[in-house]
Amino acid sequence: MTINKNIMKIAAIGFVGILGLSGCNDSFMDKYSETSITEEGFFKSAGDLEIYTNNMYGYVTSDYWDVASDNVIYVEEASIYSKMRGELNPDNASVWGWGSIRNVNFMLARADKAEGDMAEINHYIGLARMFRAKLYYDKVLSYSDVPWYSRDLQTTDTEELFKPQDPRALVVDSIMADLDFAVTHMKDESGARTRWYRSGALAMQARIALSEGCWRKYHSELGLNDADRFFKVAADACKAIMNTGNYELSTGEGAYEALFNSQDLSSNKEMIIFEDYSNELGRKH
């Protein structure tokens, strides 16, 4: 009888143990890697979004020749001819590459998981949307009509992957919506001008709006007769920058040369944002 009681006690303890295991907190069982970044364990805070957007700074570089600036409209003849000959592929295509835009969309699709100060979170969402606007307008300058994607596509999204190009008007309106969000939600300048803040986003908005306005004014074949609204956006953005009182034209002898031939631009009040080159940190042109 005593043996049977002991067996029953052991069985009861085992049953309670099983119940305890089945009642464990799900988060205890679902542990994510603590030594590598995973999608499930990331995008939880504004700090995560900041880390992710740091990688996007390379999407806007200092243009060291006119073909890479908005002073010259670059025609993608080489890429077009390569495509006609069947030679174009993801490894040799340049402007037609979509990896950077997908990286931005990847973050934007998951940014709603972030918790904390919404002003901080929206700053980095606005920053990402500004980068997407710049990346997309580069494609518009080269091809005019391009497919617009607002989310990161998967290999199973065959319909969207093979969809035709969207009209320039739709793409540019989407670009301007990204820039509107950026200038509304990004924080005002704070600290070094080597980081993107609202004034930098306003400058990007002005630059893209002015370029698009000029295209629509002088290219009637587009059938887009609303250049003036883009000129107004550009003018309003420039006025907003001036109204901050943080910037002023560089004047005096050698002022123009100082803009392009100085080792340190941190004290130049004409700089809205600049890249600080440093041999020590390995940041070079």
Summary of predicted features, one role per range:
Residues 140-141, 147, 190, 211-220:
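Short coil/turn linking the two alpha-helices of tandem helical-hairpin repeats
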Residues 21-23:
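C-terminal motif of bacterial Sec signal peptides marking the signal peptidase cleavage site
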Residues 71-73, 145-149:
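Outer-membrane beta-barrel and related beta-rich outer-membrane complex signature
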Residues 146, 154-156, 278-280:
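Solvent-exposed loop/turn segments at secondary-structure junctions
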Residues 2-11:
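Bacterial N-terminal signal peptides that target proteins for export
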Residues 10-18:
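Sec-dependent N-terminal signal peptides
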